[in-house]
From Swiss-Prot:
Renumbered residue ranges of the record's region Has a strong tendency to self-associate leading to formation of oligomers: 294-442
One Pfam family in the UniProt entry: Ricin_B_lectin
Listed Gene3D superfamilies: 2.80.10.50, Hemolytic lectin CEL-III, C-terminal domain
Annotated residues for binding of Mg(2+) 2: N187, V188, N228, V229, D275, V276
Organism of origin: Pseudocnus echinatus
UniProt-recorded name of the protein: Galactose/N-acetylgalactosamine-binding lectin CEL-III
Binding residues annotated for D-galactose, in chain numbering: 19, 33-36, 49, 117, 131-134, 144-147, 178-181, 191-194, 219-222, 232-235, 266-269, 279-282, 286
GO molecular function: calcium ion binding; fucose binding; galactose binding; lactose binding; magnesium ion binding; melibiose binding; N-acetylgalactosamine binding; polypeptide N-acetylgalactosaminyltransferase activity
Coiled-coil residue spans: none
Length: 442
């Protein structure tokens, strides 16, 4: 079994997250959701909606939190009842009822061809599993005796690597794919290209095309992959997945084939203007689109020393800071998020897709504003008590190709080591020893 709890010390904010994303139930494929949208209260499964209360943080202190509010998953009682999103008890230490570990695993391949790994999530106080009330994997979430049933397995969903990010410009009209209205919800049509997030999309290995404004998927009205196209919550269904075969490309302009119907993304009429739907692939320019984006260099990740003590514990105030010569606009924030998700270099090697996805989510979350916190090294990642050593804060650097401007981001992500040599393990991985020279995936 893999432990979710490398350390038991309290974190006001989660400064060493192990994973961030949609936590889905293996049986129903629905998302773990905090009822309402404030991040507090009853926990149940729900259709995935892309909102922050469904962005779950698996924290290195053993707690499970959500991005909408810094609350902990807490069984109502002594670890034997319904689970709530409640204030974390931090002092004198986190109680075992708010700490969790991972149990048995089940690997499977989803509809997009991406391998997922679902695990049991076990409460330390009761030794019972996170469990969905309904045997179909829908309903309220509590804890129950571990029975190795599908509704007791959960996974942070991966879409695979991000392949493209930007606006989609039509070859015929030079107009861009646009979500009608200003909220990034509803019908999709062609419109003059502009720097609004409802025109920016991410394209993933599993075939999903996700709108940057609302985190929803390009979706065909008919479940058979035929009909009008809009954006809708991402359901892990083939009518929301698209391929981009080279046979349907003309230079940088390519057609998108719906995986359910094998029909092409098509603009109504023959001028490349108007509403968007699917139609038989005809090889005409109104069915071809080009990715238009601003380039950033591949980001690099390093650990910077923030304090050492060879005779005791290290305490430092940790802030989230961004250094950039220009304003970090909403457009720049999304570009950087996409750049991070496409790949990060640490110690001259590329980090895993899981690490880049989690870093991208951490970057996006940091844009809403954070407060400085005082953090103390009480334990090493290996769960041994911290007796001496150094604290390290993560730094991410990338350069905008067009302007040459450097952006440096120092998030509230830290590691504590015995050595005064920088940790050898990437963020969102675990140090297997006190000097952090050996690493394990979480």
């Amino acid at each position: 079994m893999v432990s979710l709890v490398p350390c038991g010390f309290a974190q006001v904010l989660c400064t060493n997250p192990l994973d961030i994303g949609e936590l889905r139930n293996y049986k129903s494929k629905q998302c773990v959701d905090i009822v309402g949208n404030q991040g507090s209260g009853n926990i149940a499964t729900h259709d995935c909606d892309g909102l922050s209360d469904q962005q779950i943080i698996m924290c290195g202190d053993g707690t499970i939190r959500n991005e909408a509010r810094n609350y902990c998953f807490t069984p109502d009682g002594s670890g034997n009842a319904n689970v709530m999103s409640s204030p974390c008890t931090l002092y004198p230490e986190i109680p075992s009822s708010q700490r969790w570990r991972l149990g048995r695993k089940k690997a499977f391949t989803d509809n997009g061809g991406i391998e997922q790994v679902a695990t049991e999530i076990i409460n330390l106080a009761s030794g019972k599993c996170l469990d969905v009330e309904g045997s179909d994997g829908t309903g309220d979430i509590g804890v129950y005796d571990c029975q190795n049933l599908d509704d007791q397995y959960f996974y942070i969903r991966s879409r695979g690597p991000e392949l493209f990010y930007g606006r989609l410009r039509n070859e015929k009209s030079d107009l861009c794919l646009d979500v009608e209205g200003s909220e990034g919800k509803g019908n999709v049509l062609m419109y003059s290209c502009e720097d609004n997030l409802d025109q920016w999309f991410r394209y993933y290995e599993n075939g999903e095309i996700v709108n940057a404004k609302q985190g929803m998927c390009l979706d065909v009205e008919g479940s058979d992959g035929s009909g009008n196209v809009g954006i809708y919550r991402c359901d892990d269904l083939r009518d929301q997945m698209w391929s981009r075969p080279n046979a349907y490309c003309n230079g940088d302009y390519c057609s998108f084939l719906n995986k359910e119907s094998n029909k092409c993304l098509d603009v109504s009429g023959d001028q490349g203007t108007g509403d968007v739907g699917t139609w038989q692939c005809d090889g005409l320019p109104d069915q071809r689109f080009k990715w238009v984006f601003d380039d950033w260099e591949v980001p690099t990740a390093t650990w910077n020393m923030v304090g050492c003590d060879q005779n005791g514990k290290v305490s430092q105030q940790i802030s989230n800071t961004i250094s950039f010569s220009s304003t970090v606009t909403a457009g720049v924030a999304v570009e950087v998020s996409s750049t991070i998700e496409k790949g990060v270099i640490f110690a001259k090697a590329s980090v895993s897709v899981k690490v880049t996805a989690s870093l991208s989510k951490a970057w996006t979350n940091s844009q809403s504003g954070t407060t400085a916190i005082t953090y103390t090294c009480d334990n090493y990642d290996s769960d041994e008590e911290f007796t001496r050593g150094c604290m390290w804060q993560l730094a991410i650097e990338t350069t905008e190709v067009k302007s040459g401007d450097l952006l440096v981001w120092n998030p509230q992500i830290i590691k504590c080591t015995r050595s005064n040599t920088a940790p050898g393990c990437a963020p969102f991985t675990k140090c297997a020893n006190e000097d952090c020279t050996f690493c394990t995936d979480i």
